[in-house]
């Protein structure tokens, strides 16, 4: 099962920092997908049957409604967005509810050729530099930067040996903060100066608040087939 680390109060204080991040100019964007992790979920609250070890192929392969979609975007100034938006492939509405709220004088987006980005860019009057499916670049346009972020994120998250979906957004915020601070400050100042700044003023959080955190997504959508059988 692996070790599920405690969620420190600082992760919730980070929301204040993340809230103020805006993306401008040239942006790269792509979807990142995570499997559902139900650690810390009590047996009586399980939305699906318990999984058993088996050699049988899983019923849902690839990107399905059993995968959590995270919109990930970075601009030319290294401002980063990682936000849980729902299940399955990214849609135009998912982009509106996440990236759409973070734009400030944005000009263009490098992304795949999915219709979701085409419709999003048309509505927000942005230039879409579409990258063909299966490629990371198309001439002068690429998504190397955001793919590099995905690689760093995977390495960083693997250190925790599994993170509950309940707290995934807080860990994504933590990663964004570390990524941002590394870009802005000397590494030896990150822990001593920058971490303390976000905890000043009204960021007091009780331990009980952490355990009352709700799921960032509705698991009934992902496990509807189990609910219909009951």
What residue spans do the PLM features occupy?
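Residue-level recognition of single "structural anchor" positions
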Residues: 1-230
